[in-house]
Amino acid sequence: MFDLFSNVLFTNGDVKNPMDVNVTSTMCSVCGSRSAFFFRPYSGETLCQKCFISSIEKKVQTTIAKYGMFSFDDRVAVAVSGGKDSISLLHVLTKMDRTHPKASLVAVTVDEGIRGYRDEALAIAEENCGKLGLEHQIVSFKELYGFTMDEIVAKSRLKEGKKLTPCAYCGVLRRKALNVAARRVGATKIATAHTLDDEVQTMLMNIFRGDISRLVKEKPLTDEVHSRFLRKVKPFCEIPERESTLYAYVKKVSFQDVPCVYSNEAFRNEVRSMINRMEALHAGTKFTVFKFVERMRHALGATLEKENFVDCVDCGEPASSGLCRACELLKQIRCI
């Protein structure tokens, strides 16, 4: 497991360092007036807590501007799972009013219905939204689909032959639920907390699978392909996962640190381990992969045909054929 805190130099009592690294006298390379607690291998910086927090917030502002993620009057639905990344993103985006004073935020959480896991996450999301004074919309699988995730998993395990993983069902159903919930609250865009690590892992997985279409589509700001598909933005796409986590610790915000009981994507875990080993040996590898794919996307996109959508015959949402993918999966579950 790649340790998220391996670059923490020391603690002054505010941040617990699980590695128990000895205290050093290194000074912050930005302000020069406070002791550093974090070393950034890819930039060579040593940062104090204040400059670290400032660097994350400035980087997100730069990323938003770089990709033109927000319009001046956007209503942004922030996908909040209750985990470290989504909670960190929520707190960073509340500062957006400095640059986008007419924009507004609303938090959206999808309740998949996973007993012993989602209950805690919902409470944490609600707590953070309350502290930030944000509206919080919750949409559940049970309400939308008639099944909880626990029920879907139980039924899918009765299926004969090749079975989809719980993550395969959940990913499709969550994306649809998030889009529906965001439209309900009048959002114009959806912000997700995909970090640099998430993006690079997905890029490599798509390359290994030869999936050019997904490689092109999954941009920091997705294209507008249908009026009922809200565009998604990824303000954390250039923030390493360990820095998103450390931001939450330094800010002392509550988040869920227990992994989902169904999370077991073997392929993603293999890719994660590989890219983390490369990053440890060659600092900046993740940024290099990310920037390379970003440069390739425009050229690759020209080779793809434009998607045509029809209305799903079951739910009326946009679909590439008679049934949208979510309704296809639900139909399979109902037939078991």
Regions flagged by a language model, labelled:
Residues 2-217, 238-251, 324:
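ATP-dependent adenylation/nucleotidyltransferase module used to activate substrates
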Residues 57, 65, 75, 189, ...:
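Flexible helical/loop "lid" subdomain adjacent to adenine-nucleotide binding pockets
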